[in-house]
Amino acid sequence: MLKQYLKEHYLANHKALYVTLDDFWFTNHHLIDVAEYHYLHGGTVLFVDEVHHYPFVTWSMELKNIYDRYPEMQVVFTGSSMLQIDNTLADLSRRCVFYDMYGMSFREYLEFYDIMNVPKISLEDLLQNHVKIGLDITSEVKILPKFQDYLHYGYYPFYKEVTDSYEKILQQIAANIIEVDIPAVEKIEYSTVVKLKRFFALISQMVPFSVNATELSKNIEVPRQSINKMLALLKKSALVNLLYNGKNTMGQLAKPEKVYLENPNLMYALTPRADIGNIRETFFANQLMRNHEVTFSGKGDFLVDSLYTFEVGGKNKKFDQIKDVSKSFLAVDDIDTGFGDKISLWMFGLLE
């Protein structure tokens, strides 16, 4: 992504420099020396990729020093989702703005592939006006085939470049996150990495599922108390989403009620016979968890912002399970537009 931006905006001059810190060259060279050389030779922009692979423990301090020494230089850096803004990054966080980079929402997918530009909508607007919004969109685009394409290959923007090997690449990315990214950030032993990989392979065939720590610990031969910690690592690395019963105030100690893979594309790549009902729930959780609190609901599938209850299903889904629940809605697949409190599932991919 950084290289693409550089090509589009800085190809004609030498004021911008791109480096990736997983390059072998950085095993005995420091980033701050590169920044100094670039600045002294007229550089004004420095793109730094993969900071979590920097072989020295000083990457955040070096970025801070670059900012302080060369205030005219703009620095853009990327790192694994494993990098949390904690006390070790406090000095750096006061000097820069951090962004979480998610995969594409369905709305972003429609725009990326030049299918249709749809404005962002709020959840409240969707709940109140979904019929009109849906009719406006479906009058211009046959939306259901596009939605099915999105569920299979629309989450990551590189599908166009790797069409025939997309699912294989997703498998490789998942393995690389566990084998390389997590150990680069977390202090874990190789034996733990092996068990974490086994754990992820196991749960990818089970999702979504309710957590039975005793059974899982037997299958991968780890202490029972390690299961929640392993799930938390997979969550931080954007491989799974965890659904808790109410607000999680216990961090890694809390037991999630349900585990999902992070997005439907991963499900199709890792679970060839993925159940469509599970795909639907995975999509809903993925799209809503970006900007909303999504927790386990005892009556429906999801409780959003401690206010709205949602049941997810196919076009024949009924209100039976949530008929007595206030502010409850059906998120239904295989319909262009909904009616009343029955909302087309694809529309939850339009949220801001």
Regions found by a protein language model. Name each.
Residues 25-27, 53-55, 84-85:
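Catalytic P-loop NTPase motifs of RecA-like helicase/translocase cores
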Residues 52-76:
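Conserved Walker B catalytic segment
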Residues 114-264:
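Interdomain hinge/linker elements that couple catalytic modules in large macromolecular machines
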Residues 83-98, 112-114:
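Short regulatory helix/loop adjacent to the ATP-binding pocket of P-loop NTPases
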